[in-house]
Amino acid sequence: MNQPNYDAVLIIAASEKDANLYYATRFLAPDPFIYTEIRGKIYLFMSDLEIDRAKSEAKVDEVLSTSEFAKRLQTKKVEPVSLNMIDLLYQEEKVKEILVPNNFPFIYGEGLLKKGYRLMTKEEPFFESRLFKTEEEIAKIEETQRCTEAAVEEAIHVIERSRIENGKLYVNGKPLTSEAIKKIINVKLMEFDCIAEHTIVSCAKDCVDPHNQGSGPLLANESIVLDVFPRSAKTGYFADMTLTVVKGKANPKLKKMYQLVKEGQEIGFKLLKDGVDGSVVHNRIAEHFEKEGFKTGQIDGRMQGFFHGTGHGVGLEIHEPPRVSSVKQTIQASQVVTVEPGLYYLDAGGVRIEDLVVVTKTGIRNLTKFPKVLEL
């Protein structure tokens, strides 16, 4: 990614938490390490603990030993700290101008500036190529999606088999709760070596807040929104899916909302393709809801209607560019995005349906295979 206006790229982070660093190295580590690309050649600084693993796993040109650099610095009577190791390498390679991500650690940035280096930052996407998924990356995302669907299927079977008693769902004589369904999903995902955080199983009025994770007993004849977005511990890639179900009978307004959200999703499927403006897709869906009488805005002191974006990119992060929203942004082939319109009203509940798709030159390829059924 080098350009004439800088000599080196520098990232200092833990690749387990920094998607850009993992993308650049394909090396997963829990502790921070130094990555630098100097005029096209990629180096890592690694401790004795991780150096052999890095040499065998990391997709880089050279792995440098921090302990060896520390010895070299000590002979120069320079403190053997990371900043001075970077400085020593950059002096040898005649580096003056450095590109860093916008979350670069301040302490290192300040130290490099004091040593006379010029720093430039870059907004996301730091690596432009992350926007476009290779077939290998798509296969990894799809693998995580299949695991997600298997976990959700197990949860749906439990909801389906539950009994209705006094307006609540029961299994084996005990109330069926949001927490119980989340546990079923998360444990099943662990069997597939997938890690789920903040899984959503919300019910009734809780559904009106799209990011409410849900709690307490699940109710009969009310909307239940399940939103599951795990990361594969093996590959690092996320999947994302949402469905809405009702155990029992949905009220007429909720049925209409479900129908409209499905129609909105179909509008998204038809419009998404290489070169389309994401805001056109989002606005067309919003207009469809408005036309059918489902308004968006403050109602009784709460945001209700369709008040979030239609979709977002998915990859090494659960939310990454591009966005399909009211903000203009060109969607391009080989991007993986969600299509997840929703409608939310306090007097009826919430509905969201989310599929994961690959954008192609002429349309989309849907990675989601799970059936959409409202009433169980």
Which residue stretches match the model-derived regions?
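Active-site neighborhoods and metal-handling regions in enzymes and metal-associated proteins
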Residues: M1-L376
